[in-house]
Design a protein with these regions (language model features):
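Acidic/His- and Gly-rich active-site-bordering loop/insert found
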Residues: 3-89, 108
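Zn-dependent metallopeptidase/amidohydrolase metal-coordination segment
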Residues: 6-22, 80-81, 345-386
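A short beta-alpha structural unit
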Residues: 29-31, 262-269, 281-288, 313-332, ...
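Flexible, glycine/charged-enriched surface loops at secondary-structure junctions
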Residues: 57, 114-118, 173-178, 228, ...
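Acidic, glycine-rich active-site loops and adjacent beta-strand->loop/helix elements
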Residues: 60-62, 83-85, 119-130, 192, ...
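Glycine/charged-rich beta-loop-alpha catalytic/anionic-binding loops adjacent to active sites
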Residues: 75-88, 220-226, 342, 375-378
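A generic, well-ordered mixed alpha/beta core segment in the N-terminal half of proteins
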Residues: 85-158
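Midchain, well-structured core segments that form catalytic/ion-binding scaffolds
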Residues: 126-127, 131-290
Length: 387
């Protein structure tokens, strides 16, 4: 039975993981930053060492292609993920899916195994969406869900323009995104949750990726003295925000989804002043589209009620709306069979996080393979994956 060189893969994950660690000890490689350029350069160098042909498209997606005269006209099989990170990140998220694909090709070449199809390893631009929105941008553009022109014009949180930054770091490619449609796409990823580690599973065959709705909410109240304004005479934006947070938790406990108030700020943000303004984000997720849509409707209805009861003014702005994505059943079954043939404990999974695979599922049969996240930790320097 063919096996990859696990030590080599882990060593390369460690090397890539060193890139982007600042003086504060935090690992951060935001999309199209200098640190991410260094990470891109490392991955490209490893692809070239393995004898792969490098293609970079207009949105900066990197592809390492292994083909031959015999199979280059056949529709390729693609694997991949991303190498950009969140702030203060772990070293496995995304990177495992890129470097493991490269390791598979190296192993096949070293053992003299020829494949029916070309194999492509992809590293997609801006999966995390920290510096530029939306997340999963590179794969979304590749799959035709967002125009490349619009994506390249995206203004980042630091005022930079994505297209300018890709050009600056040397990754403004020459090939149109979507230059090839794969026969199938597989993304290997850490679970980013606690289930597999807690239940002792080695492999997750991911058959669904839950839908995601993000929105910004702005609340206008009235600033007033914290000590002299009676409770029943306050128009408190901070209190309204807190009520929305509690409502979201109670809502998803009924629907089986999850909801998160991930960012929040108050104005004037003073210890002795009732907040006149509150700005925050809401992240709602559910693997069932009907339940996801209903949760958003329930929240919007509640906001109207809150305006009346608390005398505040509330406005909303959609950020991201991705429907749940069912993955290819045949691929999921093959993942299960392969795991069992190696005596690995496998279970079906739903991905709670957005991934590049959900975008690639728009254009080809797609599935994901999960490995456990030890203690469920991810987006954290303590992130560890295991088999």
């Amino acid at each position: 039975m063919t096996e990859i060189n696990g030590k080599r893969l882990l060593a390369e994950l460690k090397e890539l993981g060193k890139i982007g660690i600042g003086t504060d000890g935090r690992r951060t490689r935001l999309a199209a930053s200098d640190a991410e350029k260094e990470g891109r350069d490392y991955v490209v160098s490893k692809m070239k060492e393995a004898g792969l042909k490098i293609v970079i498209d207009h949105i900066g997606n990197i592809f390492g292609i292994w083909d031959s005269e015999e199979n280059k006209s056949i529709q390729p099989f693609m694997v991949g993920s991303h190498i950009d990170t969140v702030i203060n990140a772990g070293q496995y998220d995304g990177c495992l899916g890129v470097l493991s694909g490269l390791e598979v090709i190296r192993t096949l070449k070293e053992q003299g195994i020829r494949t029916k199809r070309p194999i492509i390893v992809g590293a997609f631009t801006n999966e995390e969406g920290v510096r530029y929105a939306p997340d999963m941008m590179g794969s979304l553009v590749y799959a035709g869900g967002l125009s490349c022109k619009k994506a390249l014009a995206t203004v980042g949180t630091d005022g930079t323009i994505l297209g300018d930054e890709l050009k600056r770091i040397g990754y403004e490619g020459t090939i149109a995104p979507g230059f090839v449609t794969p026969s199938a796409f597989i993304e290997l990823h850490v679970e980013q949750g606690p289930i597999m580690d807690a239940e002792g599973y080695n492999i997750g065959a991911v058959d669904n990726l839950q839908g995601i709705h993000w929105m910004k909410i702005h609340i206008d109240g009235v600033a007033n003295h914290a000590g002299t304004t009676p409770t029943n005479m306050r128009i408190d934006a901070g209190l309204a925000a807190a009520k929305i947070n509690v409502f979201c938790r109670e809502m998803v406990e009924k629907s089986g989804g999850v909801a998160t108030i991930g960012t929040i700020s108050f104005k004037p943000n003073a210890v002795n002043v009732i907040p006149s303004k509150a700005d925050f984000t809401v992240d709602i997720r559910n693997p069932k589209k009907e339940k996801l849509d209903n949760d958003e409707k329930y929240l919007l209805d509640y906001l109207k009620t809150l305006e009346e009861t608390d005398h505040v003014k509330i406005t909303t702005q959609p950020m991201t709306n991705f429907d749940p994505v069912p993955f290819d059943e045949d691929l999921c079954k093959k993942i299960e069979v392969a795991a069992k043939s190696r005596n690995l404990k496998v279970r079906r999974m739903v991905s709670g996080a957005g991934q590049d695979a959900q975008m690639m599922a728009r254009i080809c049969p797609t599935a994901m393979i999960f490995v456990p996240s030890v203690k469920g930790i991810s987006h954290n320097p303590d992130e560890i994956g295991r088999a």
